[in-house]
Structures are given as C-alpha cells and as structure tokens.
A protein has these predicted regions:
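Catalytic core of pol beta-like nucleotidyltransferases
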Residues: 1-24, 30-36, 47-96
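Short beta-strand->loop micro-motif that forms the acidic, two-metal-ion catalytic signature
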Residues: 41-44
Length: 96
C-alpha cells in the first residue's frame, strides 16, 4: 500500500502551513509494506523552533488522512536507527 498522490499533496500543504521546511516519508509506507493498520512515519525539519506546537501538524495530518501519524525531527533521530530510517526516505517536501 502506498500513499496516493492527493494524500502526499495534503501532507505538503499542511507542512507549508506549519513552518515545516523539509518532510520525508519513511517506514512501511516508504517501503511499500504498509497495510490498513499502518501509521504514517514522517521525518521533518521545522524552519523555526516550535516547542510543542509541532503536535498541531501531526494532528492536522491525522485528521486529514484518517490515519495515525508519527512526526520525527532530524535532531531527535536515535543514532541506532538513523541509517535504517535514512535509507528508506522518500522526500515529499523541501531539500535535505
């Protein structure tokens, strides 16, 4: 299962509204292994500090797509899984 083009476009639109300068898909959707219960894993970079406001973007994407979303910032990536995540990345918005 993949994200449809219109779903990716909705994510990009939400990123723009929430000061996200980079967004990439990783995990089961990026590997085309997602099923009906899979969440959407997104690696993001904010253009300015957000505090806990980053949750607004996650909730907005969840509401729009009807699926749980995990937003992870580049700075919060564990060194133990960083390479695993980076090899799956599908950039949706912005530049690495």
């Amino acid at each position: 299962m993949n994200l449809a083009l219109n779903e990716k476009e909705k994510i990009v639109e939400i990123c723009r509204r929430n000061d996200i300068s980079f967004c990439a898909l990783f995990g089961s959707f990026a590997r085309n292994e997602a099923n009906e219960d899979s969440d959407i894993d997104l690696l993001v970079r904010f253009s300015k500090p957000k505090g806990f406001d980053w949750l607004d973007a996650a909730f907005e994407i969840e509401d729009e797509l009807g699926r749980k979303v995990d937003l992870v910032t580049e700075k919060s990536l564990s060194p133990h899984i960083r390479d695993y995540i980076l090899k799956d990345l599908q950039v949706l918005y912005g530049e690495r």
